[in-house]
Amino acid sequence: MRRQQERKSMPDAVKKVYLIHGWGANRHVFDDLMPRLPATWPVSAVDLPGHGDAPFAQPFDIEAAADAVAAQIDTPADILGWSLGGLVALYLAARHPDKVRSLCLTASFARLTADEDYPEGLAAPALGKMVGAFRTDYAKHIKQFLQLQLLHTPDADGIIGRILPDLARCGTPSALQEALDAAERADARHLLDKIDVPVLLVFGGKDAITPPRMGEYLHRRLKGSRLVVMEKAAHAPFLSHAEAFAALYRDFVEGVLDEPSGRTLAGLPPSCRTCRPTPDTRPQRAQTYPACRGGCGHQPQPAGETLSAGGI
């Protein structure tokens, strides 16, 4: 695991952001998102073992991948993980709580496959058939995957044109099968109660790989988390709805309080916003909030948010 394409910032910048990609991709999948984040933020996109330029020593191990990211972090950081990268981020936050200031999990999961205690999972994950296709012609099939995720996105061709050359240049990930096997075996549900940082969950309403019900499960289990479903997004909201996603993430990170509790006002229900008011300038969002955990005694509110403005 190595730190890659680090963007430098002002010397006094206090926020450090790490982006962790998903299965079958590499750090360049974030090439369209990074310029949309504040220029004062130091942002690093990393390659998971056996992806991009990162070497691969078998077996692919999620805990080891999380430890490798932690080794790069010298001060509590804001972590954004997509899909498999979100699973790695969960292990990172649970195993190295001193390294994580906040989490954003987009189109991710605590467990991928369903069982009798976890109906939110997939009955039969369909990613396996992509392994052979990626190995046969990675550039062709990663492009097709991106086109599917960006269906109906106005600037789809432009987005793909900006990220595909570097994404495809790295070639087929050497850990393709091993990383998929690890993702299908993984079960991070026992870690969720250990995570005590602000968490933003962003899911796509049309995502068939990690459907919104997986986000709802995480939202129930991660205390103080905030769930946002982008109704018309699929498995890559940060690509298909880049501006809205970047604004959402920017607001989240800026709202994280530098307090030991790590709580944010954004996670409080409307009644608690009366107790601790914060302006809401985005009435187009159909907002609901989780139960208050601040001890004020307010009753639980319906959970989750839906972004539907502007065709999102």
UniProtKB/Swiss-Prot annotation:
InterPro entries: AB_hydrolase_1, AB_hydrolase_fold, AB_hydrolase_sf, BioH. It catalyses: 6-carboxyhexanoyl-[ACP] methyl ester + H2O = 6-carboxyhexanoyl-[ACP] + methanol + H(+). The active site is at S83, D207, H235. Its EC number is 3.1.1.85. The keyword Transferase does not apply. It is an enzyme of class 3 (hydrolase). Residues 17-241 form the AB hydrolase-1 domain. It comes from the Bacteria. Pathway: Cofactor biosynthesis; biotin biosynthesis. SUPFAM superfamilies: alpha/beta-Hydrolases (SSF53474). Keywords: Biotin biosynthesis, Cytoplasm, Hydrolase, Serine esterase. Its main location: cytoplasm. GO terms for biological process: biotin biosynthetic process. One of its GO terms (molecular function) is pimelyl-[acyl-carrier protein] methyl ester esterase activity. The physiological role of BioH is to remove the methyl group introduced by BioC when the pimeloyl moiety is complete. It allows to synthesize pimeloyl-ACP via the fatty acid synthetic pathway through the hydrolysis of the ester bonds of pimeloyl-ACP esters. NCBIfam families: bioH. Belongs to the AB hydrolase superfamily. Carboxylesterase BioH family. This is Pimeloyl-[acyl-carrier protein] methyl ester esterase. It comes from Neisseria meningitidis serogroup A / serotype 4A (strain DSM 15465 / Z2491).
